[in-house]
Structure formats: structure tokens, C-alpha cells
């Protein structure tokens, strides 16, 4: 619904396709996100539109955090072979991201334990690091919605 009006405007680079979210309507509302490749070499991309901006006319920090949370969750689920939820996310804002920019993010599982996965996510704009995050994703039992013990 909402994302469809922006898909054509996104002018996506070659080899990206729409990312069909499995995490509910939230991602559909703030996107659209696009995906290229397969785990572990997957990249998510997004065009920054005016409605993604803050009062300074650049990408809102919360948007960037949601973007890396999606990437980290995707990587955690693949690396941990389990449904996961974000337990901790430390964010590092390096440079502002202007409206109409195309950003790309990728993540790497640094460590996979019995109950948690430690992930590093980086967001690039024109090959320049603009945002990064380190996080912990907790494995859960999707049916019960509780952490695995």
C-alpha cells in the first residue's frame, strides 16, 4: 500500500529487488527497502525521501536505526538459524545522509552463541561509511515469543 507509491521513485540500482518484509507493517511503512544478494553477502538498500528527513533536512536518525535493526535482524536470523529479537543496539552516526541519497547496508555475524548473536552493521553512501551499529539479537521461540534458554 504505502510503499508502492515510492517504489518507482526510488530509482534503484541494478540487481536490487523489493525487500518483502517478514517483520510486519512497520518496515513497509518506513521503506521501501530493497535487497541484493544472499546471506552472508546480502545488501539492503533504500532511497531517502523527504518524509524520511528530520528538521535539518537529512535522514532522521530513527530511520537509520530502524534500517540497521532490519539488517541486523535478517543477518541474526540467518546466522543463528532462529527467529530473533533485538536485545541491544549501539549506534554510531558518522555523517548526515541527504534527502534523495541511496544508502546501502550490510551486516556481519561476529559471534553466534546458544542464545544470542552479535552483529555489526554498516551503512554506506557512495562508498563512504555514514552510520554503523553493533548489536545483540536474542534467539526466540516464535510460537511462544519468549527467549530460548
Regions found by a protein language model. Give the residues of each.
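Terminal targeting signals and extreme-terminal segments of soluble enzymes
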Residues: 1-149
Amino acid at each position: 500500500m504505502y510503499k508502492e507509491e515510492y517504489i518507482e521513485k526510488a530509482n534503484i540500482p541494478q540487481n536490487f529487488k523489493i525487500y518483502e518484509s517478514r517483520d510486519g507493517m512497520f518496515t513497509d511503512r518506513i521503506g521501501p527497502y530493497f535487497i541484493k544478494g544472499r546471506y552472508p553477502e546480502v545488501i539492503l538498500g533504500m532511497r531517502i525521501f523527504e518524509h524520511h528527513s528530520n528538521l535539518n533536512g537529512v535522514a532522521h536518525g530513527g530511520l537509520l536505526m530502524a534500517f540497521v535493526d532490519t539488517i541486523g535482524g535478517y543477518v541474526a536470523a540467518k546466522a543463528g538459524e532462529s527467529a530473533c529479537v533485538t536485545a541491544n543496539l549501539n549506534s554510531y552516526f558518522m555523517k548526515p545522509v541527504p534527502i534523495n541519497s541511496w544508502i546501502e547496508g550490510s551486516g556481519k555475524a561476529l559471534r553466534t552463541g546458544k542464545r544470542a548473536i552479535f552483529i555489526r552493521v554498516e551503512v554506506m553512501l557512495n562508498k563512504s561509511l555514514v552510520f554503523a551499529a553493533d548489536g545483540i539479537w536474542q534467539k526466540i521461540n516464535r510460537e511462544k515469543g519468549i527467549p530460548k534458554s
